[in-house]
Amino acid sequence: MPSPRAGAAARIAVTAPAASSFSFEPVFLVLATAAVYGYVRLAKRVERPSRGRVALFVLGALLIATSLNSPLETIAVHYLLVFHLLQNVMIADWAPPLLVLGLTPAMRALVAARGGRALALLTRPRVVLPVWLAVWYGVHLPVLYDYALRHPWLLNLEHGALIAAGLVFWWPVFSDLPHRLSSAVRLVYLGAAYAGSAFLSLALIFSARAFYGFYEAAPRLWGLSPQKDQNLGGILMNGEQLAVFFVAMSYFLLQLLSEDEESQRALEGR
């Protein structure tokens, strides 16, 4: 008699679409389109952005739209955890900083003004850091992760939470409003975020068992076992976060050193 897990795998295999087929999440396609439309309106009414800023913002919107409306979505929600984790880092770690960097200073000032006290509170490092970490770990809890994969409404909610948390996390890194942080504070903030979030990827890398029952029962691609799939997902997550945070922290470290040099020159010039 086949085991319950084998039976579940057979049912999923029957219902799973071809890995190369497109999946669509219209809500994120609409949101990405609306973001670009709003950006164009701001560019006309507030401040004309440089081509570089336009490219950054559009790339951020495209990452959200394409990661959730493509074969990547199909493989992520029907076959492999590593592809789902790739989706998550694209919408949580890549797209948000690109969107924030794509805004001009005048655009950020307008957003900060309209965000009012709520944005001022949410973008305080001591508030946003634990919120960001709570969303990051909460979304990846096995019980919620497995349930969301079987209930699209919750999966969409989780993806939306990752995007929103990413935006408020990266806002104080690249925007001086509503709070102007020193380079030293931004450096510590980013370091604490990386250190705090790394435990998840390390657990995925070194665990001897698969955490997510959905992917244990899912049809396999390219001969990847559930455990190997999970280990690769952890390596991917850890590697990309290391790269993203290293680049950001390196920038602010150079800024800090430059500020120290300027202060020293000012003292010597007295």
Describe the function of each predicted region.
Residues R5-R270:
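Alpha-helical membrane segments of multi-pass proteins
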